[in-house]
Amino acid sequence: MERASLLAAPLGQTEVFQALQRLHMTVFSQSISPCGKFLAAGNNYGQIAIFSLSAALSSEAKEESKKPVVTFQAHDGPVYSMVSTERHLLSAGDGEVKAWLWAEILKKGCKELWCRQPPYRTSLEVPEINALLLIPKENSLILAGGDCLLHTMDLETGTFTRALRGHTDYIHCLALRERSPEVLSGGEDGAVRLWDLRAAKEVQTIEVYKHEECSRPHNGRWIGCLATDSDWMVCGGGPALTLWHLRSSTPTTIFPMRAPQKHVTFYQDLVLTAAGNSCRVDVFTNLGYRAFSLTF
């Protein structure tokens, strides 16, 4: 009897610890696999969890279908941002970007392929990298975060080629308008800034918090998440999660979510996923109906 109770104690402690972890968890980043069947989500504990979207969206889905297929430790600190290439999952934390093979991720003991650090003013400066953005036509990666700059990295050579300045406070998020081509960035200064990549300069600014229907002064003005399909943009953070028409710079839909959101993703104009200050990833279909939530 004593032996049984001794064996049970650690198990109970583990369950309590995991429950406390979920209670204090923030999902900072998401990325959908190239095949569209899996969703990677990164949290404040440095973990990346891989969910099966095909299983969760199935008509026969059970609660277990909404749990991670695999979870692994990717960074010592929070996983602030992630993005997927045809073969790799790229993740970023405090001052570093790592690459993982999608083909190996579902296996236990997945190891990083490489790690890169942007050039900073001093060796003591290690600002967080809040956002990653792929520019396929240039085969490059844009990184942005705590130093208020947009850094461009050549994915073939691993070298950093330019830095764009404009934000007055640190940057939280990035998105690409492929037709333009323009990059959108959102930051602590409350602005969404549009950058022309060919001219390497800022061409438009939308100060979201100045629109009454979006403004939530008690949450602040910061823009924490951003996504676009070229004609439309979704952004949120301090202001409410809102769908915008970019050409007219007008808000059209306010999503019914109270908590500030840290990440939002479009997928083929059909699915919108949003995550923030909880262990949940909310999934919307038809850009308005909340279908279900995934949980760590």
Ranges and model annotations:
Residues F17-R22, E60-E64, P68-A74, G109-L124, ...:
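Short C-terminal beta-strands that terminate individual repeats in beta-propeller domains
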Residues H24-S31, D76-V83, P118-L134, D169-L176, ...:
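Canonical WD40 repeat/beta-propeller blade segments in eukaryotic WD-repeat proteins
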Residues G36-A40, R87-L90, E138-I142, T161-R162, ...:
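Structural hallmark of WD40 beta-propellers
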Residues G42-Y45, A92-E96, W102, K137, ...:
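Conserved strand-to-loop turn within each blade of WD40 beta-propeller repeats
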Residues I48-S52, V97-A103, L150-D154, V192-L197, ...:
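WD40-repeat beta-propellers
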Residues S52-E60, L101-G109, L197-K201, N286-S293:
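Short loop/turn segments immediately following beta-strands, especially the blade-tip
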